[in-house]
Amino acid sequence: MTDVPAVRIRNFCIIAHIDHGKSTLADRLLQATGTVEDRKMKEQFLDNMDLERERGITIKLQAARMNYTAKDGQQYVLNLIDTPGHVDFSYEVSRSLVACEGALLVVDASQGVEAQTLANVYLALENNLEIIPVLNKIDLPGAEPERVIGEIEEIIGLDCSGAILASAKEGLGIDEILEAVVERIPPPPNTINERLRALIFDSYYDSYRGVIVYFRVMDGTVRKGDRIHLMASGKEFEIDELGVLSPTQKQVEELHAGEVGYLGAAIRAVADARVGDTITLSKAKAESPLPGYAEANPMVYCGMFPIDADQFEDLREALEKLELNDAALHYEPETSSAMGFGFRCGFLGLLHMEIVQERLEREYNLDLIITAPSVVYKVITLKGEELYIDNPSRLPSPNDRQRIEEPYVQVEMITPETYVGSLMELSQNRRGIFKDMKYLAQGRTTLTYELPLAEVVTDFFDQMKSRSRGYASMEYHLIGYRENPLVKLDIMINGDPVDSLAMIVHRDKAYNVGRAMAEKLKELIPRHQFKVPIQASIGSKVIASEHIPALRKDVLAKCYGGDISRKKKLLQKQAKGKKRMKSVGTVDVPQEAFMAVLRLDQS
């Protein structure tokens, strides 16, 4: 099965925006090459997770090996490495691009180029990939291939003279795509005689076989039974299973330079086989690891606490298992006076956070309280030390710090002209700095803003979608830290600060956010037997407060007429009881209150 020379191997991926038909195209390629029999075919064959099929997005990376007989009569091996299209998963895209020599750029012929497609195309160009433009969905009545070709040439600067018109749904243009892959994408370099180097681009945990590693052999040959050395973690293992993905796993004896496959080596901890690590042989180690991989750094943090304290260990186990499949998920234990024991988790972005939360609840049956997301701030202390703070409650006091810096991102939005004004207003309200605006063909515009990440992670995406009636798309990337007058806003309920509600805000916005927060909590916290004050404060200065009135029992109900002093005595007794209750009573804060921060109307 592996006797195809490197000259006849093609490694490629598909770059596309959500909903532009990437998974359907992958399905058609699998069918056309006979890799998957028609009777076993189901939609979105490579999207394994239920969540992926439901949301119609690709989250985890998949790979498939196809045998294809081209028009020149030669037998070729095509390795398709499927990539996610969402901005949060750009690290997954970057590692699949490193394993390829070419890419199919799939663009919806009725919608045109979207912002996230751009980001991935730039990544592909940086990795010197050969890009083949494919216009999908040409069977739709609204398809305008000429306009879209113009857009690709104008925005990306790609030559589209060889663009392929296709409809994955109808099966049009599939043969042309396969021929183009063979003719235009270069074969992998023939480095079979060099020392083994292979790139890990994905791994997942199998409860029977341990960690299964997906990899691309860059140099040399790997055989079943080899003892391998992982260059970043320094661990060594013996390969007991080696195979290719077509798309189900098929075992083979050896894989050569240019091939894509999987291995099992009784690896127990995912941390030992990190994505992006280089595999080499223990007895003949490569001199240097493969370049171009960076650790995925979380940009957004939040607290996760089990509603039932007994589930803490279950949550720990669930996170450990998820981390196995998700190189970018970070977590550490944390305690909160309001919520008890839980974890502080780091994510790549909001969609990533939602998906992890949904998987914990769905696959592991956990009931969770999630605190509002926050970003990583850089604090310069008086001694000149740099601290990175991902939890507002850990911020040093104003007397111990010189300044606070927050992460900024460059946001690119592509939108129909009609909504430009509304999106500019949204960006200005979120402390955005206008950078650029370009008019594209057919009444579409690109807007470029620099925004604090903290303003983007709450509900910027939802607001952008609602203001543009779903037509705008956005992409963002980190551009560094900048100093701003930021303050820590504490929320106190019944005189006690609630650490999970603390947040870092811009000084100019502090009053409005504090006011809105106090009002929202007043609505959400149920009434108690005693009066509950809610205060928003900066340091010791209270900037907004609300009161939840007490529930009162009518202690005078049994006094008909009679002496006023009797009534006073009963009222004083009640007041004394309330006072005592207030000092020892705890306030029950419902889960909705912790998510209220997300829904404050700031726009």
Curated annotation (Swiss-Prot):
Where is the tr-type G domain positioned along the sequence? 7-189
Q: Which UniProt keywords apply?
A: Cell inner membrane, Cell membrane, GTP-binding, Hydrolase, Membrane, Nucleotide-binding, Protein biosynthesis
Show the GO cellular component annotation of the record: plasma membrane
Q: How does it sit in the membrane?
A: Peripheral membrane protein
Record-annotated residues binding GTP? D19, H20, G21, K22, S23, T24, N136, K137, I138, D139
- What Gene3D superfamilies does its record include? 3.30.70.240, Elongation factor 4, C-terminal domain (3.30.70.2570), Elongation Factor G (Translational Gtpase), domain 3 (3.30.70.870), P-loop containing nucleotide triphosphate hydrolases (3.40.50.300), Translation factors (2.40.30.10)
Subcellular localization: Cell inner membrane
Q: What is its EC number?
A: 3.6.5.n1
Pfam families documented for this protein:
EFG_C, GTP_EFTU, GTP_EFTU_D2, LepA_C
Q: Which family does it belong to?
A: Belongs to the TRAFAC class translation factor GTPase superfamily. Classic translation factor GTPase family. LepA subfamily.
- Name-wise, this protein is Elongation factor 4
Protein encoded by which gene: lepA
